[in-house]
């Protein structure tokens, strides 16, 4: 269950960061009169509607796994911000529609920045609410006072020192991943040589600059964790296994630094090459995996310090259901891989400036 949770969350985070970063970058590029900038804006916008489907579909499995693993805590925190939590559905629907309008207006040569900006603000709101819930579930000491203040869940929690750095980390990570995404696009055969150079230059510089902010936010988020959590990540807990989560944090640091170096080489050197394109993809995925492993350790150790032991439970496994899930999951990945191969073999359409 844990491995499935970590795997699906990692994929979900990759899609989320692509959406958050790619959308605002598309908005900013659309404001320029540079033909290559407009080409980049349209290229990102056309892909964002697809990215949004992955954000939603890859977000459901980890939420269900989290409900099984942390049900009492997550259910309680969700009820305490119930008004905001249920509003996420409507906000996502509106964001999805705005993404299509943003793309359509760009393709028609109309001003679209304001549509994209509204969509980005709505996506950021959802990210904020999710961060709020994921941190509120770790704070049972405030649940009673919040319920007393509003039984219908009309208030958001305050006084959490970890919320701001965690949210900033996700937002900065969006631009970091968005820059790496541009590096990948610069290696696609569907763009002109001029567009490739522009994407490599801009994507590399954005990823390098925002990667530094991402690092700083990550160090800040780690620094505000309670002493018991830090000790647990160092292997000083009832479960030494969480030492691996602490080690994942150091691997995350190394991977982000490596990505910043690669991005700087490609961005400032205007390097367009297959190795930079695919290295960007590999580093982006590995960075998110390490982040998720570290994050999981922080969550479990925080709850453990408050007498919620995720491992202390009676497990009655329904192997038939587990087997069906694994078959469908692997089959779904196979179908996605086949669809990707079909797209890769299809005749390429140049995405030049309009």
In which residue ranges do the predicted regions lie?
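N-terminal signal-anchor module of multipass membrane proteins
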Residues: 1-52
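Hydrophobic cores of alpha-helical transmembrane segments in multi-pass inner/ER membrane proteins
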Residues: 15-27, 86-101, 168-185, 249-265, ...
